[in-house]
């Protein structure tokens, strides 16, 4: 027994019935095949427990209750053998019965043991016969008469059998004759064990004509010489004994009171004592490995002893077979509207109960009305339940129709898809009708109520997807302003409102863009991502945007996950509390990111940090220490509220609460280094400098504080602060205006930029966040009036100031406030465009040192991009998530969430100059997320291409690839490509139309509702095949090849324009293309379709991406001179607007802007 042996677990012996009391264990034994401990009880049931935790495994009724307790358990490779007074039973370890043997002469069986043949056991008892049983066949082989009543047996060199008179007989293993007999104990043998050449017994003797007592000696016998050895003294009374399976001369001896002694038989003085916590011990057993000891006590408990560091029942155990986990039945959406055919019913011949006539259907059992959340703070416990004052929101005896509320439609109905509007417009024109395709928010009804319901714009907004994807959704229905909204259906998009607030704070916006323009290439830089997002929102000019890259970076921070700030951690959490924590995290992280590039600069701290010091004074010893107490966010601290004085007490004014929150004097318990213990300490904050941007968390964790915010005009648009000798003076309203007129020294005026609020409309809508922002502060031109806007994800609309700053509604809770110094109004600094760090464009950057294509050459200083420089672009993507599709009962499908793609490769080529068509960027992007599909057929990306350990390509982080494109964008480059709108959306970058040339729309016929593929155009114009299946001589899909082909098509289109044959070319393209299914024919020597001078064209369906090949088609040949090429001209936008879905209704080119 090692020094750390102790009790590992304790369990109760299972009762005989579900409602019965626990019973004592009459037999315990460790399995020598599996990690199981077997227990037999008084009712003939044997139960097994698995592992050191004694997890219940099997339980079997092996013997009838009338036969009494289970008396012994033996183990064989094939199963477990148990013995009762009148039967022998064998089961598998999983509980299946193998055989059950009874005999008329089996009257009082007590013991059993294996014989010399391992497939046979001998059973005996206090009866006149012994029986030999064949384990394999399950029947009695021999019946042996005996004159002894045997109570227990142990097999070693001999079969040692104890009698009921205290003697021990050594029987021959072959014929079971008595070889030697010892009078071991005066009355009876209580326990014994034999191993190798040693036998140890414990028993009872009578002293002085009294009752039998436990002998204080454990007798030892040498089975090799059949002679006794010196006994083991055990003064507590040797009641139970087990020999150690590995240490041949070591034995465990135990008393009935729980004392355990480990003794060496050859050296009785070397002992190890333990005391088990039992009242009365009934038996012990030692595992075959010697690492575990089981104790059975009189309180119906089994104790497992061993070393916590290692405990195994066997040296080499077989794996325990557990029952298969039953498969859960598929979930069924059972409702009154579910047809029986969806569930599956048996055949029937009578009328079903579901055919109940409709005029006999009555509504009963309506759901109870939900509890008004505004009453929760006022609930008081009663004898039964709780009570609260009546809010008097309904009339007397008026009852809420909860069933109608449960079946109500969403408050804000999604608009029609653009494709549907285009079809309706076409139909309306044919019928002579006029329809309004630009529906406004005022035209939508809320549950059939008034059309001008003010709650509409606060409702949850959700993107709907048609088979054409997100481009078919009418975002202009929700936003007719010049300010862009942010899309949902992105992980952590609940932060959209806070990101919009940051964007409209000029000083934060300037810092983010200046940092993005610097040399920062840190992968998880939140400040860079904010700069990219703010630039995208400004370039979008009212079009919808998405913060995919920023939110992915936010989700990658372990700190954010551990603090529970991610969307996956928001279950049962208040959005108000969460967004305030996110606000604190964002500001702390961007401060850290700023110092990564400019570690010695305090520019950001000057803008965001409240510079202060904290003095901590022990209230016991009066010792005081001072430490820095800078903070990026100030949390409002409210005083005790007296409802009667709430409007008259000046302490309840916002300015006074703000001052107390910044100075912050508190008392709590803390560690005192002088007292060397926890004491009551006073903490006082001394402010030295206030920031230019003051971020405040409202901390409305008590409903009583909402009374202050409900006061009209309580939140001021402007506050004035004065820092004087570590003290703060705060003014608002008339006091502020008076001091501004008097030019008070040191007065700094802050104006409110915006508020992030939680909206929780209790009409089956989930809580969400919106922001109210004064957009005039960030305008580049001075404005005389303040214009407030509501940003509800991608719903953006103008609201008046009173509505934005009114918080008397119970469903509108302010969370985050942002104030900025008034002197920084309109301080929109765009100088970052002149100081772009373009080093990344002129040098190679690689994670793995992977090789680039042989033709790639980075830009030289002589090739520095300038405004109007054309570059050809093509990107490839892989699937990170498959689309989530809802299949309805009628078989129709609705896209709930589209597939999620990840940028995998970016190729950029020179579009002009002597090295035209030569790539200078060809980056593969490493992806840490799980890739569900490489879509190799369309992307050319194969497994292993994006793994730094195996990739042979130039791998870079997404941040590096994105920044290269962002630099080209802001240097004024014009991007030439095919299907660029989809690429830009997946990259998450906003490119103005004046910097885009999309060949998908160049070769577009205004009267044909079809867009042609790059693959088809390449064959038709240049007689070349691209995007083919990979072969030995062809690598298959290649983004460099696609970008170069788009560049050549653009040049060719310019030639068509110079020749004045664009319309004729397009007509013939579509006419001949329709014969070929707008697909290139198979390779058979066929030439291009066109027979006109200078042309060779065909086109394709879908979005211009790798349409499968068609059966072989032969086209006519053409041979003609080409039109003269024209020098490069700066191009304008050729990509349609977001809302233009059906190009057949108009001309995107507007008279060919290339001219």
Swiss-Prot record:
Residues 1097-1106 have a biased composition (Polar residues). Residues 871-1049 form the Exonuclease domain. It is found in: Cytoplasm. It catalyses: Exonucleolytic cleavage of poly(A) to 5'-AMP. Positively regulated by the regulatory subunit pan3. Its cofactor is a divalent metal cation. Keywords: Cytoplasm, Exonuclease, Hydrolase, Metal-binding, mRNA processing, Nuclease, Repeat, WD repeat. Residues 1107-1124 have a biased composition (Low complexity). Gene3D superfamilies: Cysteine proteinases, Ribonuclease H-like superfamily/Ribonuclease H, YVTN repeat-like/Quinoprotein amine dehydrogenase. GO terms for molecular function: metal ion binding; nucleic acid binding; poly(A)-specific ribonuclease activity. Its main location: cytoplasm. SMART domains: EXOIII. GO terms for cellular component: P-body; PAN complex. Transmembrane segments: none annotated. InterPro entries: Exonuclease_RNaseT/DNA_pol3, PAN2, PAN2-PAN3_catalytic_subunit, PAN2_N, PAN2_UCH_dom, Papain-like_cys_pep_sf, Quinoprotein_ADH-like_sf, RNaseH-like_sf. It comes from the Eukaryota. Residues 453-822 form the USP domain. Residues 316-452 are annotated as: Linker. Binds 2 metal cations per subunit in the catalytic exonuclease domain. GO terms for biological process: mRNA processing; nuclear-transcribed mRNA poly(A) tail shortening. Catalytic subunit of the poly(A)-nuclease (PAN) deadenylation complex, one of two cytoplasmic mRNA deadenylases involved in mRNA turnover. PAN specifically shortens poly(A) tails of RNA and the activity is stimulated by poly(A)-binding protein pab1. PAN deadenylation is followed by rapid degradation of the shortened mRNA tails by the CCR4-NOT complex. Deadenylated mRNAs are then degraded by two alternative mechanisms, namely exosome-mediated 3'-5' exonucleolytic degradation, or deadenylation-dependent mRNA decaping and subsequent 5'-3' exonucleolytic degradation by xrn1. Belongs to the peptidase C19 family. PAN2 subfamily. Contains a pseudo-UCH domain. This ubiquitin C-terminal hydrolase (UCH)-like or ubiquitin specific protease (USP)-like domain is predicted to be catalytically inactive because it lacks the active site catalytic triad characteristic of thiol proteases, with residues at the equivalent structural positions that are incompatible with catalysis, and it cannot bind ubiquitin. It functions as a structural scaffold for intra- and intermolecular interactions in the complex. This is PAN2-PAN3 deadenylation complex catalytic subunit pan2. It comes from Aspergillus oryzae (strain ATCC 42149 / RIB 40) (Yellow koji mold).
């Amino acid at each position: 027994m090692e020094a750390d042996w102790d009790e590992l677990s304790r369990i109760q012996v299972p009762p005989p019935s579900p409602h019965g009391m626990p019973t004592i264990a009459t037999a315990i034994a460790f399995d020598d095949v599996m990690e199981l401990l077997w227990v037999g009880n008084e009712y003939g049931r044997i139960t097994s427990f698995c592992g050191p935790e004694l997890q219940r495994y099997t339980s079997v009724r092996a013997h009838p209750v009338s036969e009494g307790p289970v008396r012994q358990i033996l183990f064989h490779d094939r199963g477990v053998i148990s013995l009762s007074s009148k039967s022998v039973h064998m089961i598998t370890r999983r509980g299946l019965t193998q055989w059950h043997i009874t005999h008329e002469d089996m009257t009082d069986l007590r013991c059993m043991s294996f014989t010399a043949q391992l497939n046979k056991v001998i059973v005996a008892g206090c009866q006149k016969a012994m029986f030999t049983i064949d384990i394999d066949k399950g029947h009695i082989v021999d019946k042996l008469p005996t004159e002894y009543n045997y109570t227990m047996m142990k097999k070693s060199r001999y079969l040692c059998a104890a009698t009921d008179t205290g003697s021990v007989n050594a029987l021959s293993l072959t014929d079971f004759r008595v070889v030697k007999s010892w009078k071991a104990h005066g009355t009876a043998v209580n326990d014994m064990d034999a191993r190798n050449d040693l036998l140890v017994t414990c028993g009872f003797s009578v002293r002085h004509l009294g009752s039998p007592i436990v002998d204080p000696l454990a007798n030892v016998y040498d089975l090799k010489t059949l002679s006794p050895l010196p006994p083991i003294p055990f003064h507590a009374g040797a009641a139970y004994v087990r020999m150690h399976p590995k240490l041949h001369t070591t034995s465990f001896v135990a008393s009935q009171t729980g004392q355990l002694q480990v003794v060496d038989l050859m050296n009785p003085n070397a002992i190890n004592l333990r005391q088990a916590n039992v009242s009365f011990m009934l038996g012990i057993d030692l595992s075959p490995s010697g690492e575990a000891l089981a104790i059975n006590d009189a309180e119906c408990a089994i104790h497992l002893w061993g070393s916590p560091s290692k405990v195994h029942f066997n040296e080499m155990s077989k794996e325990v077979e557990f029952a298969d986990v039953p498969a859960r039945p598929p979930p069924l959406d059972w409702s009154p509207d579910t047809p029986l055919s969806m569930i599956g019913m048996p055949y029937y011949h009578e009328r079903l109960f579901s055919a109940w006539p409709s005029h006999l259907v009555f509504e009963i059992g309506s759901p109870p009305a939900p509890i008004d959340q505004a009453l929760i703070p006022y609930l008081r416990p009663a004898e039964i339940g709780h009570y609260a004052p009546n809010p008097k929101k309904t009339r007397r005896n008026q009852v809420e129709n909860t069933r109608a509320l449960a079946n109500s439609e969403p408050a804000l109905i999604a608009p029609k898809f653009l494709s549907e509007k285009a079809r309706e417009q076409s139909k309306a024109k044919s019928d002579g009708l006029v329809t309004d395709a630009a529906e406004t928010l005022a035209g939508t009804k809320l549950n059939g109520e008034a059309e001008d319901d003010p709650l509409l714009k606060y409702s949850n907004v959700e993107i709907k997807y048609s088979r054409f994807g997100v481009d078919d959704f009418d975002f202009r229905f929700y936003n007719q302003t010049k300010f862009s909204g942010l899309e949902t259906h992105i992980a952590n998009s609940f932060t959209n409102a806070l990101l919009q607030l940051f964007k409209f704070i000029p000083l934060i916006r300037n810092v983010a863009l200046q940092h993005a323009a610097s040399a920062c290439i840190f992968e998880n830089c939140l400040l860079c991502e904010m700069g990219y997002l703010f630039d995208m929102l400004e370039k979008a000019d009212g079009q919808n945007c998405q913060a995919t890259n920023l939110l992915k970076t936010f989700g990658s921070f372990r700190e954010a996950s551990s603090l529970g700030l991610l969307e996956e951690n928001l279950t049962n959490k208040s959005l108000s509390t969460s967004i305030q924590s996110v606000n604190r995290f964002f500001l702390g992280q961007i401060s850290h990111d700023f110092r990564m590039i400019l570690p010695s600069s305090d520019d950001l701290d000057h803008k965001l940090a409240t510079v202060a010091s904290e003095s901590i004074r022990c209230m016991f010893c009066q010792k005081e220490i001072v430490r820095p107490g800078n903070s990026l966010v100030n949390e409002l601290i409210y005083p005790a509220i007296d409802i009667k004085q709430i409007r008259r007490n000046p302490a309840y004014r916002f300015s006074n609460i703000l001052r107390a929150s910044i100075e912050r004097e508190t008392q709590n318990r803390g560690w005192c280094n002088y007292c060397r213990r926890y004491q009551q300490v006073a903490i006082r904050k001394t402010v030295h400098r206030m920031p230019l941007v003051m971020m405040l968390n409202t901390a409305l964790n008590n409903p009583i504080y909402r009374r202050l915010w409900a006061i009209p005009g309580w939140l001021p648009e402007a506050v004035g602060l004065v820092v004087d000798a570590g003290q703060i003076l705060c003014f608002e309203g008339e006091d502020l205006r008076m001091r501004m007129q008097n030019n008070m020294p040191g007065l700094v005026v802050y104006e409110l930029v915006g508020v992030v609020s939680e909206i929780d409309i209790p009409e089956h809508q989930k809580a969400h966040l919106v922001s109210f922002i004064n957009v005039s502060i960030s305008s580049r031109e001075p404005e005389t009036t303040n214009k407030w806007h509501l940003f509800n994800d991608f719903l953006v609309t103008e609201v008046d100031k009173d509505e934005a700053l009114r918080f008397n509604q119970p469903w509108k809770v302010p969370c985050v406030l942002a104030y900025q110094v008034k002197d920084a109004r309109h301080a929109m600094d765009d100088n970052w465009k002149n100081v772009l760090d373009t080093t990344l464009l002129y040098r190679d950057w690689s994670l793995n040192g992977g090789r680039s294509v042989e033709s790639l050459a980075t830009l030289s200083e002589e090739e520095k991009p300038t405004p109007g420089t054309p570059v050809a672009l093509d990107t490839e993507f892989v699937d990170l998530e498959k689309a989530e599709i809802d299949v309805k009962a009628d078989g129709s499908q609705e896209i709930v969430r589209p597939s999620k793609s990840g940028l995998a490769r970016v190729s950029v080529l020179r579009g002009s100059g002597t090295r035209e068509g030569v790539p200078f960027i060809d980056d593969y992007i490493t992806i840490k997320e799980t890739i569900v599909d490489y879509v190799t057929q369309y992307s050319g990306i194969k497994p292993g291409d994006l793994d730094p350990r195996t990739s042979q390509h130039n791998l870079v982080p997404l941040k590096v690839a994105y920044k290269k494109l962002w630099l080209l964008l802001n240097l004024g480059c014009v991007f030439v490509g095919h299907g660029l709108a989809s690429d830009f959306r997946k990259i998450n970058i906003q490119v103005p139309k004046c910097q885009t040339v999309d060949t998908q729309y160049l070769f577009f016929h205004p009267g044909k509702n079809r867009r042609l593929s790059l693959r088809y155009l390449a064959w038709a114009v240049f007689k070349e095949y691209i995007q083919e299946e990979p072969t030995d001589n062809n690598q298959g899909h290649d983004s460099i090849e696609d970008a170069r082909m788009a560049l050549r098509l653009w040049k060719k289109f310019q030639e068509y324009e110079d020749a004045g044959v664009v319309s004729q070319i397009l007509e013939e393209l579509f006419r001949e293309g329709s014969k070929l299914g707008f697909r290139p024919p198979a390779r058979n020597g066929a030439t291009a379709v066109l027979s006109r001078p200078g042309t060779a064209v065909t086109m394709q369906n879908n979005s211009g991406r790798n349409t499968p090949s068609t059966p072989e088609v032969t086209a006519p040949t053409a041979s003609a001179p080409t039109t003269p090429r024209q020098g490069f001209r700066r191009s304008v936008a050729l990509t349609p607007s977001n809302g233009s879905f059906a190009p057949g209704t108009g001309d995107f080119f507007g008279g060919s802007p290339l001219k």
